Amino acid sequence: MSERKYFGTDGVRAVAGEFPLTSAWVMSLGAAAGEVLRRVNPHARVVIGKDTRQSGDMLEAALAAGLTSRGVTVIHVGVLPTPGVSYLTRHLKADAGVVISASHNPYEDNGIKFFGADGQKLSDATELQIEAAIDEVPGFAPLTGTAMGSVTNYTEAEHLYTDFLKSHAPDLSGLKIALDCANGAAYRVAPKVFQAAGADVFAIYTTPDGRNINRGCGSTHMDHLRQIVREGEYDLGVAFDGDADRALFVDSRGQVVHGDHMLLLNARARGEQAVVATIMTNMALEAKLQDAGIPLERTAVGDRYVHERLHEKGLSLGGEQSGHVLFLDISPTGDGVLTALLTLASMKKLGTTLDALHDDLVMYPQTLVNVRVQDKKAIAVDQQVQQAVRQAEEQLLGRGRVNLRPSGTENLIRVMVEGQDAAEIHEVARVLAGVVEARGQA
């Protein structure tokens, strides 16, 4: 595959206003994407949605200008969760969808992510075509008059997406639920859906001002939600991130119920043939699934890898501890509000509670040591390191596991050891990290 210049695993991300997320570059991106799309369909239509960041307006306008300059019709759906844009792209039979969001990042950051007509992440091949076309934008033949595209505001977007979510909501009557909407894209949708399902809802962080998204709130800052649930005697709490593609729970005691817990509960309730998770997923989940006769498949860290494995194996359920859970039989992308609703449906089906789930799945101790090295690629093939890993695995056989992986951004090797005995795994990690450090400086 060709080397990417702009697109990462989750689209284009940067500080808004700095390259590449300047108005000029984003307009070129829109023109390039429009040109690629109109080669397939001269009357292409693109859905654009965003989260609540202040920079979203500027990026949305620049992107729409570029797209319409190449004859594309732009459909604005306004502030909507990322999965809502995926849903509207499919529902409106558009040629593509675009989300302007940086998920759980601070408000200064933003990003641009494309969906295909199927509501899934745009294919690598199409992204590479768009990247190549960006450099060609100055040479595009200008379109004038009726050849230019137009912009429409689709005012029914939130209503349609909310109806979709309601169709998958269980009866939540009698449940007292606190919601943390992160001052993000779910600030209107989530409370509406949970109230419509019959829950007694108390929603916090529902007053976005363009700068307070994810600030001390949401699924990466859950202390306030935990306090509210404990002190207010709520049955549970749910926290979303800025673009609401993931969700985490809090049980009635204020304890966090994360993705591993959700995978176990949903796998049991839905009778899944297998579950896909990552190398960071706790062994305790694997053991519990094994008890239920459900195998666990592991992938590299990242929801895209979970998604790929689910497709390869024809499976439905997968996810990460972060609360990014996929139900591919219902939605082609992670959806925090949907995940929360389906998890509560599974809870009701099994007649259990999040408190009981938290107590049932006791996580194995896990230790992570970051070791700075000169060449992280060399460590991956170093024979002495490989021998040390084999020895560690033999020592932990049946009681734990070892994983070494390079940092994606720094010259670090992350040494992760997990097992039933905390003292043992700390000693194994110490010895293994020592070998990595010695070889990393050799």
Curated annotation (Swiss-Prot):
Its EC number is 5.4.2.10. The keyword Phosphoprotein applies. Activated by phosphorylation. It is an enzyme of class 5 (isomerase). Its cofactor is Mg(2+). Keywords: Isomerase, Magnesium, Metal-binding, Phosphoprotein. The active site is at S103 (phosphoserine intermediate). One of its GO terms (biological process) is carbohydrate metabolic process. The modification Phosphoserine is found at S103. Pfam families: PGM_PMM_I (PF02878), PGM_PMM_II (PF02879), PGM_PMM_III (PF02880), PGM_PMM_IV (PF00408). It catalyses: alpha-D-glucosamine 1-phosphate = D-glucosamine 6-phosphate. InterPro entries: A-D-PHexomutase_a/b/a-I (IPR005844), A-D-PHexomutase_a/b/a-I/II/III (IPR016055), A-D-PHexomutase_a/b/a-II (IPR005845), A-D-PHexomutase_a/b/a-III (IPR005846), A-D-PHexomutase_C (IPR005843), A-D-PHexomutase_C_sf (IPR036900), A-D-PHexomutase_CS (IPR016066), Alpha-D-phosphohexomutase_SF (IPR005841). Binds 1 Mg(2+) ion per subunit. Mg(2+) binds at S103, D241, D243, D245. The keyword Phosphoprotein applies. GO terms for molecular function: magnesium ion binding; phosphoglucosamine mutase activity; phosphomannomutase activity. GO terms for cellular component: cytosol. NCBIfam families: glmM (TIGR01455), PRK10887.1 (NF008139). Catalyzes the conversion of glucosamine-6-phosphate to glucosamine-1-phosphate. Belongs to the phosphohexose mutase family. This is Phosphoglucosamine mutase. The gene is glmM.
